[in-house]
Amino acid sequence: MIIDYFDNESINEDIKNYIQRRIKTYGDLCYSYLVMNKKTPLHPTIISNYPLDWVKKYKKNSYHLIDPVILTAKDKVAPFAWDDNSVINKKSTDSAVFKLAREYNIVNGYTFVLHDNSNNMATLNISNGSDDSISFDERIEINKEKIQMLLIITHEKMLGLYQSNSDKNENRNTQIERDIFSPRENEILYWASVGKTYAEISIILGIKRSTVKFHIGNVVRKLGVLNAKHAIRLGIELKLIKPI
């Protein structure tokens, strides 16, 4: 059975405690264990000791869809530093996710990556917390293999707990459809994706042009992008738009 959503609070709390007991071996570090299914990436699980406000804003705005660190991780199998060229090339100084990171001083770190056979990507993202950057970099470099193994064992443990929980509740399993867009937003984004103008969309749907712009604005905000053109492209690339 493929598990797309890791949203059991009890299991996630167990995993958080497991990580925290082991991560402290490497210093006073901030970490974020992020898991998402690459085919249905809209609802990642984030288990972290980062500030709760950061986690809430990151998830609410679906920043994992535009985060250069996560975008880089999709193409990686080895650990990498956040100042690696592969990350820098994806950075945008106007990116909402980096504005949020600077606000909480989450700017210097490393990411460890794992891709499993159920199409999930797991990352263990570590930043230096109260450690100075030089000693932090040295400590991570020395312990790279151990931290990568921590990610592997953690992810295997998490999959095992969810599989066990799924087996217990197999008869009660129901698929809950989770959409990032409202039905109206999806309609408008669909017509925009096939080349219709705001004026044409307003005629097709029998609504005002200003209403079309309002919903497009919501789509832009949800995806954390700069404009409608970028939102449409991202919606197409990630297959977020349902056909009408």
Curated annotation (Swiss-Prot):
GO terms for biological process: quorum sensing; regulation of DNA-templated transcription. The keyword Transcription applies. Residues 198-217 bind DNA. PROSITE patterns: HTH_LUXR_1, HTH_LUXR_2. SMART domains: HTH_LUXR (SM00421). Residues 174-239 form the HTH luxR-type domain. InterPro entries: Sig_transdc_resp-reg_C-effctor, TF_LuxR_autoind-bd_dom, TF_LuxR_autoind-bd_dom_sf, Tscrpt_reg_LuxR_C, WH-like_DNA-bd_sf. It holds the Pfam family Autoind_bind. Keywords: Activator, DNA-binding, Quorum sensing, Transcription, Transcription regulation. It comes from the Bacteria. One of its GO terms (molecular function) is DNA binding. Belongs to the autoinducer-regulated transcriptional regulatory protein family. PANTHER family: DNA-BINDING TRANSCRIPTIONAL ACTIVATOR DEVR_DOSR (PTHR44688:SF16). Probable transcriptional activator. Binds to autoinducer molecules OHHL and HHL. This is Transcriptional activator protein YenR.
